[in-house]
Amino acid sequence: MATPEKNLWNRLKTKLPKGTHKTRVENRAGTGVPDVHLCVAKTAFWVELKCTKGDTVSIRPSQIAWNMQYSAAGGISFFLVSRVKPPCLFLFDGGEALRLATDGLGSGSLAAAAWAGDDLATCVSFMIDRASSWAR
């Protein structure tokens, strides 16, 4: 049976533009490296996939450290969070990892979400545009 993150990955793949180079990282070492590496239109970035049943987002300390250090070094990364009920998608910049882990979706961190909604295609388009603008 597929995990919720695997299902989110399968949905995400169908919404990526043609020609996207995509790599799903199956990392069991706990180093904090995000789940997915994407390269679209000469822009490379990382995406950590998270699924939650409520407002709490479970993020390991190694994931927080990796994303915050990567962001501080000028790297581009995101957290794509899928909440089951009520259903909604949230996109956070990787540099917001600590705040997301601490505050979750419902304790003020929502204001820090770069994007929120229920349409994955729109989320993907926003994520690519945001990554491209940072890469310039």
Positions of the model-derived regions?
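Conserved catalytic cores of phosphodiester-cleaving nucleases, focusing on short active-site segments
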Residues: 36-38, 42-53
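Active-site-adjacent loop/helix micro-motif of nuclease/hydrolase catalytic cores
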Residues: 53-64
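Sequence/structural signature of beta-propeller domains
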Residues: 57-58, 92-103
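Charged phosphate-binding loop/patch that engages nucleotide di/tri-phosphates or the phosphate backbone
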Residues: 108-136
